[in-house]
Amino acid sequence: MSEEYPPLTSEMSDFMVRHERVLYVAFGGRFSTTIENNSKLLQSLVEAINKNIIDGVIWSLVQSSKDDFFPTLNLTDGTQVQTSSILNNEHPHIHIIKFAPQFAILNHTNTKLFFSHGGAGSSHESMYTGTSMLVLPFSSDQFGNAEKLNSLV
């Protein structure tokens, strides 16, 4: 692990202060999933906020674009949400960013869960900061990392 990490930007710090139960989502810069999975995940995040399970989401979307999501999310209560409004950071409780100061986010007391691909760097940072993880491995060492992390529980 590095000795120095980028700090939270003022915008990110303001978001973190306004939200006491933040879910941080990051799958690294080299992994992506399907339009269906991206849209289902985004819908699930909105539903979790609406049900007051969490009150904020930071999602680091390094290589994704609007084309990686369905244009509309159909929520379980029958309402529809335009994906573009979320991806343009118009949702007050979801912050989408290209680059995340990950260690600073994980080290913030309001970050309650890290949804990750389980890469070595992410796993080490999460363990160091004591942030709980939900791991969705995509390839290579991530499957083994997920098993090792699970054995620590």
Give the positions of each predicted feature.
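Catalytic core of nucleotide-sugar-dependent glycosyltransferases
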Residues: 1-153
